A protein has these predicted regions:
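Key DNA-contact positions within bacterial/archaeal DNA-binding proteins
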Residues: 48, 98
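Terminal helix-turn-helix DNA-binding modules in bacterial transcription factors
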Residues: 20-24, 28, 33, 37, ...
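A short alpha-helical element within helix-turn-helix/winged-helix DNA-binding domains
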Residues: 39-41
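Metal-dependent phosphohydrolase cores
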Residues: 100, 108
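Proline-centered helix-kink/hinge sites
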Residues: 62, 111-112
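An amphipathic alpha-helical interaction segment
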Residues: 1-10, 14, 18-24, 49-51
Length: 132
Protein backbone atom coordinates (compact mmCIF):
# COMPACT_ATOMS: atom_id res chain seq x y z
CA UNK A 1 0.00 0.00 0.00
CA UNK A 2 2.88 2.35 0.78
CA UNK A 3 4.26 1.80 -2.74
CA UNK A 4 0.86 2.70 -4.15
CA UNK A 5 0.78 5.96 -2.20
CA UNK A 6 4.30 6.85 -3.33
CA UNK A 7 3.38 6.20 -6.96
CA UNK A 8 0.50 8.67 -6.79
CA UNK A 9 1.39 12.34 -6.77
CA UNK A 10 -2.01 13.66 -5.58
CA UNK A 11 -2.74 11.40 -2.63
CA UNK A 12 -5.00 14.02 -1.08
CA UNK A 13 -7.35 14.24 -4.06
CA UNK A 14 -10.62 12.34 -4.13
CA UNK A 15 -9.55 10.39 -7.21
CA UNK A 16 -6.45 9.22 -5.36
CA UNK A 17 -8.61 8.19 -2.42
CA UNK A 18 -10.71 6.07 -4.80
CA UNK A 19 -7.55 4.46 -6.13
CA UNK A 20 -6.21 3.77 -2.63
CA UNK A 21 -9.55 2.23 -1.67
CA UNK A 22 -9.50 0.12 -4.85
CA UNK A 23 -5.94 -1.05 -4.15
CA UNK A 24 -6.88 -1.95 -0.59
CA UNK A 25 -9.91 -3.87 -1.86
CA UNK A 26 -7.70 -5.74 -4.35
CA UNK A 27 -5.11 -6.57 -1.70
CA UNK A 28 -7.76 -8.00 0.63
CA UNK A 29 -9.78 -9.82 -2.04
CA UNK A 30 -7.34 -10.86 -4.80
CA UNK A 31 -7.73 -14.52 -3.89
CA UNK A 32 -11.45 -14.38 -4.73
CA UNK A 33 -13.13 -14.23 -8.10
CA UNK A 34 -13.37 -10.44 -8.31
CA UNK A 35 -13.92 -8.24 -11.33
CA UNK A 36 -13.41 -4.56 -12.07
CA UNK A 37 -17.15 -4.12 -11.52
CA UNK A 38 -16.76 -5.57 -8.02
CA UNK A 39 -13.87 -3.20 -7.29
CA UNK A 40 -15.77 -0.18 -8.61
CA UNK A 41 -18.85 -1.10 -6.59
CA UNK A 42 -16.78 -1.53 -3.42
CA UNK A 43 -15.20 1.90 -3.95
CA UNK A 44 -18.50 3.54 -4.88
CA UNK A 45 -17.70 4.73 -8.39
CA UNK A 46 -18.56 3.62 -11.90
CA UNK A 47 -16.35 1.16 -13.72
CA UNK A 48 -15.34 3.81 -16.28
CA UNK A 49 -14.50 6.38 -13.60
CA UNK A 50 -12.40 3.83 -11.71
CA UNK A 51 -10.56 2.98 -14.93
CA UNK A 52 -9.80 6.67 -15.62
CA UNK A 53 -8.57 7.52 -12.13
CA UNK A 54 -6.60 4.29 -11.86
CA UNK A 55 -4.85 4.91 -15.18
CA UNK A 56 -4.17 8.51 -14.19
CA UNK A 57 -2.77 7.68 -10.75
CA UNK A 58 -1.20 4.23 -11.13
CA UNK A 59 -0.39 4.06 -14.84
CA UNK A 60 -2.19 0.78 -15.42
CA UNK A 61 -5.76 -0.43 -15.52
CA UNK A 62 -7.44 -1.94 -12.46
CA UNK A 63 -7.48 -5.39 -14.07
CA UNK A 64 -3.78 -5.15 -14.95
CA UNK A 65 -3.02 -4.12 -11.36
CA UNK A 66 -5.10 -7.04 -10.04
CA UNK A 67 -3.27 -9.45 -12.34
CA UNK A 68 0.14 -8.05 -11.40
CA UNK A 69 -0.71 -8.27 -7.71
CA UNK A 70 -1.88 -11.87 -8.07
CA UNK A 71 1.28 -12.85 -9.93
CA UNK A 72 3.45 -11.08 -7.35
CA UNK A 73 1.74 -13.02 -4.57
CA UNK A 74 2.15 -16.23 -6.58
CA UNK A 75 5.90 -15.57 -6.87
CA UNK A 76 6.11 -15.20 -3.08
CA UNK A 77 4.22 -18.44 -2.60
CA UNK A 78 6.38 -20.26 -5.14
CA UNK A 79 9.45 -19.11 -3.26
CA UNK A 80 8.28 -19.65 0.30
CA UNK A 81 5.28 -21.93 0.64
CA UNK A 82 6.04 -25.38 -0.72
CA UNK A 83 2.53 -25.47 -2.21
CA UNK A 84 1.94 -27.02 -5.62
CA UNK A 85 1.42 -24.77 -8.63
CA UNK A 86 -2.26 -25.78 -8.71
CA UNK A 87 -2.67 -24.83 -5.03
CA UNK A 88 -0.92 -21.52 -5.59
CA UNK A 89 -3.10 -20.77 -8.62
CA UNK A 90 -6.25 -21.18 -6.54
CA UNK A 91 -4.85 -19.28 -3.57
CA UNK A 92 -4.16 -16.20 -5.71
CA UNK A 93 -7.55 -16.16 -7.44
CA UNK A 94 -7.05 -18.29 -10.54
CA UNK A 95 -9.41 -21.22 -10.64
CA UNK A 96 -7.89 -22.78 -13.76
CA UNK A 97 -4.26 -23.85 -13.39
CA UNK A 98 -3.64 -23.67 -17.13
CA UNK A 99 -4.98 -20.13 -17.37
CA UNK A 100 -2.83 -19.21 -14.37
CA UNK A 101 0.23 -20.64 -16.14
CA UNK A 102 -0.53 -18.64 -19.31
CA UNK A 103 -0.99 -15.40 -17.37
CA UNK A 104 2.11 -16.07 -15.25
CA UNK A 105 4.19 -16.64 -18.40
CA UNK A 106 2.80 -13.48 -19.99
CA UNK A 107 3.78 -11.42 -16.93
CA UNK A 108 7.06 -13.09 -15.90
CA UNK A 109 8.30 -14.42 -19.24
CA UNK A 110 8.43 -18.03 -18.04
CA UNK A 111 5.78 -20.46 -16.81
CA UNK A 112 5.53 -21.01 -13.06
CA UNK A 113 7.20 -24.42 -13.31
CA UNK A 114 10.33 -22.90 -14.87
CA UNK A 115 10.23 -20.00 -12.41
CA UNK A 116 10.22 -22.55 -9.59
CA UNK A 117 13.15 -24.45 -11.13
CA UNK A 118 15.09 -21.17 -11.39
CA UNK A 119 14.36 -20.43 -7.72
CA UNK A 120 15.60 -23.87 -6.72
CA UNK A 121 18.80 -23.45 -8.75
CA UNK A 122 19.33 -20.03 -7.19
CA UNK A 123 18.90 -21.50 -3.71
CA UNK A 124 21.40 -24.28 -4.46
CA UNK A 125 23.94 -21.77 -5.78
CA UNK A 126 23.66 -19.56 -2.70
CA UNK A 127 26.52 -19.95 -0.23
CA UNK A 128 25.65 -22.26 2.64
CA UNK A 129 26.42 -21.19 6.21
CA UNK A 130 29.33 -22.95 7.83
CA UNK A 131 28.41 -24.91 10.94
CA UNK A 132 31.01 -24.66 13.72
Amino acid sequence: MKEAREAMPNVGSSSSQYVLAAIKFIQFNYSHDISVDDIAQAVGVSRSHLYRVFMSNVGQSPIDYLTSYRISEACSLLKNSGLSIAEIAVSVGFFDQFYFSRVFKKVKGVPPSKYLVALEKEAQAAPQPINP
